[in-house]
Design a protein with these regions (language model features):
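Short glycine/serine- and small hydrophobic-enriched flexible loop segments
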Residues: 12, 116-122, 205-212
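Acidic/histidine-rich catalytic neighborhood of metal-dependent amide-processing enzymes
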Residues: 107-179
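Acidic/His- and Gly-rich active-site-bordering loop/insert found
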Residues: 2-102, 123
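A short glycine/serine-rich beta->alpha loop
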Residues: 96-105, 188-193
Length: 238
C-alpha cells in the first residue's frame, strides 16, 4: 500500500487493539506495510501467557556493509488496558484537533511519528527503527531485540531517540535502576573447629566495595547532573 500520512497512520494504529495481554501481530503487520525500502527483521515470541508477540527492527540507508551509525527511533506497540473509557477506545477519531483513542499518546502517535520521520530522511542517511512490545509489562520486546537482533547489531546506531511521551517535552536521559544479588559460598563445618569456610567474610569485602561505590556516587561531582537526582546505591540486606 502507499505510505500513509502521520495522522492517518497514528489513527490506523490506534484502531488496532494491542493491549499488553493480547497479540500485537496486527499492529506489527500494519507497521511493516509502511516500511517499503527498509530491511525489516521480525522477532517473534510467545509471552508468559502463550500469546504471540512480535518486535520489529527496520533499517535503511547507506550501502550494504557501510550503513552503520546514524539515528535510531524507538517506540512500542502495546498499550495499557482500556480501564475507565466511556467511549470506544479504538475509535481513532479526530475531534477538536486531537486524536482520540487508547494509545494515541502512549504511544501510537509518537510511534507513527518515528516511522514518518525515518521515511522522510534521505535514502543515503542510515536510520533504524527499534519497535518493541510488552513495554507496559515485562519489556520482553526490548529484551529480545537487545539479545537477538542481528539487524540492530549490524546497524549500530550512534544515537537513539525514544519517543516515549515523558512529561510531553524532549529530555536527554531517563533514570533507571539495576539490582544485583551477590552470593558467597562457604564450606560447612562446626563453628568450633575452624575447618570450614565462612562465606560471611567474603561478603564483608563485597560490602566494603559497595560502600566505596556509594561514597563515590554521593560525593564525586563527575557523577552528578543538575537535571537528575544524584545516582544512588543501596545495600539492602546481607
Amino acid at each position: 500500500m502507499p505510505p500513509v500520512d502521520l495522522v492517518g497512520l497514528a489513527a490506523a494504529l490506534v484502531r488496532l487493539d494491542s493491549r499488553s495481554f493480547v497479540s500485537n501481530l496486527a499492529v506489527a503487520e500494519r507497521i511493516e506495510a509502511e516500511l517499503g525500502g527498509f530491511e525489516v527483521e521480525r522477532l517473534d515470541y510467545l509471552d508468559g501467557a502463550g500469546v504471540a508477540k512480535r518486535a520489529l527492527v527496520a533499517h535503511r540507508g547507506g550501502t550494504h556493509g557501510a550503513a552503520t551509525g546514524g539515528l535510531a527511533f524507538s517506540g512500542h506497540m502495546d498499550t495499557v488496558p482500556d480501564t475507565g473509557w466511556t467511549t470506544d477506545p479504538w475509535d481513532g477519531r479526530i475531534a477538536g484537533g486531537r486524536l482520540h483513542g487508547l494509545g494515541s499518546t502512549d504511544m501510537k502517535g509518537p510511534l507513527a511519528a518515528c516511522i514518518v520521520a525515518a521515511r522522510a530522511l534521505p535514502a543515503s542517511v542510515p536510520v533504524t527503527l527499534l519497535i518493541t512490545t510488552d513495554e507496559e509489562t515485562t519489556k520482553a520486546g526490548a529484551r529480545l531485540i537487545a539479545a537477538r537482533s542481528v539487524l540492530a547489531r549490524r546497524a549500530a546506531p550512534a544515537a537513539i531517540l525514544v519517543a516515549e511521551p515523558t512529561v510531553m517535552t524532549p529530555v536527554r536521559g531517563h533514570r533507571s535502576s539495576i539490582a544485583i544479588t551477590a552470593v558467597a559460598t562457604g564450606v560447612q563445618a562446626h563453628s568450633s573447629t575452624g575447618k570450614g569456610r565462612n562465606a560471611n567474610w567474603d561478603l564483608l569485602g563485597f560490602a566494603a566495595d559497595m560502600k566505596a561505590i556509594f561514597e563515590m556516587l554521593r560525593d564525586d561531582a563527575a557523577w552528578h547532573d543538575i537535571d537528575y537526582d544524584p545516582p544512588f546505591l543501596s545495600l539492602i540486606h546481607i
